[in-house]
Amino acid sequence: MMARLKVPEGWCVQAFRFTLNPTQTQAASLARHFGARRKAFNWTVTALKADIKAWRADGTESAKPSLRVLRKRWNTVKDQVCVNAQTGQVWWPECSKEAYADGIAGAVDAYWNWQSCRAGKRAGKTVGVPRFKKKGRDADRVCFTTGAMRVEPDRRHLTLPVIGTIRTYENTRRVERLIAKGRARVLAITVRRNGTRLDASVRVLVQRPQQRRVALPDSRVGVDVGVRRLATVADAEGTVLEQVPNPRPLDAALRGLRRVSRARSRCTKGSRRYCERTTELSRLHRRVNDVRTHHLHVLTTRLAKTHGRIVVEGLDAAGMLRQKGLPGARARRRALSDAALATPRRHLSYKTGWYGSSLVVADRWFPSSKTCHACRHVQDIGWDEKWQCDGCSITHQRDDNAAINLARYEEPPSVVGPVGAAVKRGADRKTGPGPAGGREARKATGHPAGEQPRDGVQVK
């Protein structure tokens, strides 16, 4: 796996996104780089699968997969792999070496994610064997980490290896003035296709100011996110400070999306009108995403700059989207997706570090909505927006009550164990009956279960 960047004390990694305005020649060159990355990724997946197959067949072992090892193998075969089928011309010199390195690194990371998941060391969703990337299905993107890449001093252009200097729609002064002052250094520039546009994300190492930038360092607030409101902010004294309305960008664009989707369904796939409708559909989806992203960034930045301690819920957003069979479940899932409930916590997790505030994530099972903030009585309230407490007869608004309870949330005492120890997949579960040898013993590969996680990889 690729080595992680060690961020020095007082520094952090930030990304600045700009929309590119390339010429036709530059757009064609970027498209070639997208394809070159896919080619290198697919070749790496093929090589890794061949190594696994050889190990399973006769026990042939290979070196531990890494970017360095596989890049050397790629350099020995690229003259045979990157050949135009019609002209027989070798085309790999037309693209920067960074495109091929990015594809190989992506495949290596995907391989180790799969192996870590099989070994039970990776949290999150189950990850399978790396799959091949296909044009039209895979997101077009390429990352440049070395070479002639920079933000031009004129604040209107970015320079990329091989491709050259590309004009941007937005002014790049946000990052250029940091670089000019010596407070930032460019680490990588990633170009990706976003609908009908090309976006460049400039990842930089930024030196943060040492002084606290929080307006109210002693303020302690709870933030409840939801569908009715984007966020409700309250303090521990029971005062609701802010009620942020939900822009509902998907609901606003749903009528147009349906109209364009129906029009495209009546077109012949691959025709001119079909491509026009697809472009229009992409623009609408991009608009929805941009509106949602803008409101979430404005909200989370304001919270991180204003309050010293912010408490949010540890929601299982993915689990909430799996609700099926209930009345109105489809519309509810769409509304939950439109609200992006997990995004504010993700934004606050790094923005609080930037501005000197702190973030506390409440326990997933903390009953913030159904606990009366006056008498602490807990009762089932269903989906009701307003409810009356059976203990003290006070009527509560669901979101306001949850925000107040979150502001009063106290972190439980830490368990005995090594500091920073992560809970691995299944480590917090009780053991139960199962087949001898565990999950790997059920795989009929003809090899002992203990040898399976490595799949022919010799760890040196």
UniProtKB/Swiss-Prot annotation:
InterPro entries: Cas12f1-like_TNB (IPR010095), RNA-guided_DNA_endonuclease (IPR053470), Transposase (IPR001959), Transposase_put_HTH (IPR021027)
Superkingdom per UniProt: Bacteria
BP GO annotations: DNA recombination; transposition
Annotated binding of Zn(2+), by residue: C372, C375, C389, C392
Entry's Gene Ontology molecular function annotations: DNA binding; endonuclease activity; metal ion binding
Keyword tags: DNA recombination, DNA-binding, Endonuclease, Hydrolase, Metal-binding, Nuclease, Transposable element, Transposition, Zinc
Residue ranges of the TM segments: none
EC number of this enzyme: 3.1.21.-
GO cellular component term of the entry, any: plasma membrane
Reported function: An RNA-guided dsDNA endonuclease. When guided by an RNA derived from the right-end element of its insertion sequence element (IS), cleaves DNA downstream of the transposon-associated motif (TAM). Cleaves supercoiled and linear DNA in a staggered manner 15-21 bases from the TAM yielding 5'-overhangs. Binds reRNA, an approximately 150 nucleotide base sRNA derived from the 3' end of its own gene, the right end (RE) of the insertion sequence (IS) plus sequence downstream of the IS.
NCBIfam families noted in UniProt: guided_TnpB (NF040570), IS607_TnpB (NF038280)
Name of the protein this chain belongs to: Putative RNA-guided DNA endonuclease Rv2885c
Organism: Mycobacterium tuberculosis (strain ATCC 25618 / H37Rv)
